[in-house]
Amino acid sequence: MDLQGIKIGSKKGYSTGYRLLSLAIAFVITAVLLFALQPEAEGSPVAIWPYVEKEAQEAGLDPHFVYAIAFAESSLDPFADSGRARGVMQLKKVAWQTVTELPYAYAWDWQTNIKVGIAYLNFCKQILIKDRTFSYPMLAAAYRYGPTAVKNKGYNLANIDRPSNKIYRQILSGKTGYIQGVQYPILTASYVN
């Protein structure tokens, strides 16, 4: 058989062309597998989870809660843009400016966005603690609607409009730990209630 000048399967055994073709195919397959199996591609769920876990713990927040908020807000898309909010944590400009002096353009950097999102969660948490109304469902409502809106509803979750987002509905109903619909990068027993 002649494949563009490379003889394959000659009577004397494999030709040099066939060996080179086999090596090239093996090299391409190896390169593709190595690229596909990179565990921490920038902004991937596998990279985002350890970052959220570290930053949330340092800030005194439940990492599973923060990860679920990020997933609910953007499906972990670093370039998510609702027209009003940006990045993984879907931060609005006013929320961003409440907790940082960094330019809002930095909201496109997924690590900065998560860090500022956690700072805003802590800002909301401190308001709720001061008003003796802190709970993770209330914190989710304050993050989604703003702490003033939650206060105006008497800190009563029953008075707050239920979002269409299934993840937020679970969180606002008091579910913690593993949240159905959140795609965790590695599912372990610690995620399950």
Show the residue positions of the predicted features.
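N-terminal intrinsically disordered, acidic low-complexity segments at the extreme N-terminus
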Residues: M1-G5
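Residue-level detector of well-ordered alpha-helical segments, enriched
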Residues: F65-V66, G87, S135, L139
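Export/targeting segments at the very N-terminus of extracytoplasmic proteins
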Residues: A26-L76, Q111-I114, N122, Q126-I129, ...
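N-terminal Sec-pathway targeting helices
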Residues: K7-F27
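Catalytic and substrate-binding regions of cell-wall glycan-acting enzymes that process beta-1,4-linked
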Residues: F134-N193
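Cell-wall polysaccharide-cleaving catalytic domain and substrate-binding groove, primarily
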Residues: V52, A56, I69-Q97, G146-T148
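Extracellular/periplasmic catalytic domains that process cell-envelope and extracellular macromolecules
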Residues: E58-D62, S82, T133-S135
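Alpha-helical segment that forms one wall of the substrate-binding/catalytic cleft
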Residues: K93-N152
